[in-house]
Regions:
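Compact nucleic-acid interaction/catalytic patches
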Residues: 14-19, 25-55
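C-terminal terminal-subdomain/extension
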Residues: 56-103
């Protein structure tokens, strides 16, 4: 499941609702998954990873994985699978995660 991209009902940070958007599965937890948000707004924060192979991943436009927007979600919130990250993008996500999650 790691690196698969889904359309998902992703909640707003203020819990006022949700928006259907692409997400990347980071961890499979059985009925749940840890996911991060994907945005088409190109940004370059310390927790952002540019998805270089965005067409291969099933995305409609250049996109960024936002590793600072992570939640645990029920898989029932997944609407459809869009694709999977290319191996180079998977490695970039792992590297950025490891660089920023050192305790």
């Amino acid at each position: 499941m790691f690196g698969e991209i889904y359309l998902c009902r992703f909640p707003f940070t203020d819990s006022s609702g949700s928006k259907i958007r692409p997400v990347i599965a980071l961890f499979d937890l059985g009925q749940d998954a840890v996911i991060c948000r994907v945005t088409g707004r190109l940004r370059s924060g310390r927790m952002d990873v540019m998805i270089n192979e965005w067409k291969t991943a099933g995305l409609l436009k250049p996109s960024v994985a936002m590793l600072d927007r992570i939640i645990t979600a029920e898989k029932s919130l997944f609407i459809s699978k869009l694709g999977s990250l290319a191996s180079s993008d998977l490695e970039a996500v792992k590297l950025r995660w490891n660089q920023n999650m050192v305790l």
